[in-house]
Amino acid sequence: MHKLLKLAAMGTAACALLAGMAPVANAQEKQNVEVLHWWTSGGEASALEVLKKDLESKGISWTDMPVAGGGGTEAMTVLRARVTAGNAPTAVQMLGFDIRDWAKQGALGNLDTVASKEGWEKVIPAPLQEFAKYDGHWIAAPVNIHSTNWMWINKAALDKAGGKEPTNWDELIALLDNFKAQGITPIAHGGQPWQDATIFDAVVLSFGPDFYKKAFIDLDPEALGSDTMKQAFDRMSKLRTYVDDNFSGRDWNLASAMVIEGKAGVQFMGDWAKGEFLKAGKKPGEDFVCMRYPGTQGAVTFNSDMFAMFKVSEDKVPAQLEMASAIESPAFQSAFNVVKGSAPARTDVPDTAFDACGKKAIADVKEANSKGTLLGSMAHGYANPAAVKNAIYDVVTRQFNGQLSSEDAVKELVAAVEAAK
């Protein structure tokens, strides 16, 4: 059975981790994995297909549990309902502090055996290990490193604007003004709290990684209430003037489509957006440009899709470990992340198969990891527990929508974070 499980997992692991601990009651019986995830958009679904096909080729059937909603909030709601009902999925896509919450409850399994054997400690960046381990034990397998401080620009629109990529705030505003003059929507944006916060992440990071760390990771009241933070909110107000009237509630992938179709100039979004461009047959450097938000070069705010394994009966543990192993295999890390638009969760995966944006992502992550500027994203659950993140979301969204002045937003931010700690 061990051999069969090994085949089943090698390269499908992600699927499996995604899917989790496949129920393996009998080696003769077809194995099955049940996967709770929120990869439902075009590019994400393509990446998931890599996993499904790999699983199928190993004789493992797939029970899909997709939950729409890019931030994963809805998926967590479904998961809590399942666990409360005593029917947890075997593996679940999770982010940051959500993993810690389940680990604190003693609900997750232990992957130490495979992690130790394969030397995960040496190849998975320390900032990721802070979430993939709990009390010194591995409880999740990181699938990727998504970075959030990206801009995705329509190349034709950029060329019409002179072709210069903006490297600072003033150049960004000049570019957005040019897009407006071209008669297209300057910024493609979806008015959802997590999307507003994704822009705010990059804006705050543009004031320097030290400031970002003090404000969003250390939650330093002085940084949160500073004039620098007020400037960040002022910039959000300015950016708000470049979105279209119909932005409220728009899903992120529909905003990506606006840039892809030339209806908008730029989207501020994590590198999962690249999957949408690729799905539409677009090529980096020819049809679109990927670059870091101006002022954030040399730093990376990340989130990482991980698959947390729930505690399972003894007979299911071997499959669980085999699948975790498969997820971390360099071959799978490369194949999956090429399609997903992310960088591998390991620093030793060659960039050979990656396109220009992928190569840049891998290089940026390595640089940031070595400089100590690989920082957990506030907007995506890698800087703070959910209560704090949601408190920040609330202030950011109200300010972005004109319900708070920058001065009031700074005051509310300090109070909201303090109350949520």
Curated annotation (Swiss-Prot):
Q: Which domain of life is it from?
A: Bacteria
Instruction: Specify the signal sequence span.
Output: 1-27
On whether Signal is a keyword of this UniProt record, the answer is yes
Q: Where in the cell is it found?
A: Periplasm
Q: Which Gene3D superfamilies match?
A: Periplasmic binding protein-like II (3.40.190.10)
Keywords carried by this UniProt record: Periplasm, Signal, Sugar transport, Transport
Q: In its keyword annotation, does this UniProt entry include Signal? A: yes
A GO CC annotation recorded here is: periplasmic space
Q: Which residues form a coiled coil?
A: none
Q: Could you tell me what this protein does?
A: Part of a binding-protein-dependent transport system for a sugar.
Give the family from UniProt: Belongs to the bacterial solute-binding protein 1 family.
| Protein name listed in UniProt | Probable sugar-binding periplasmic protein
Q: Which organism is it from?
A: Brucella suis biovar 1 (strain 1330)
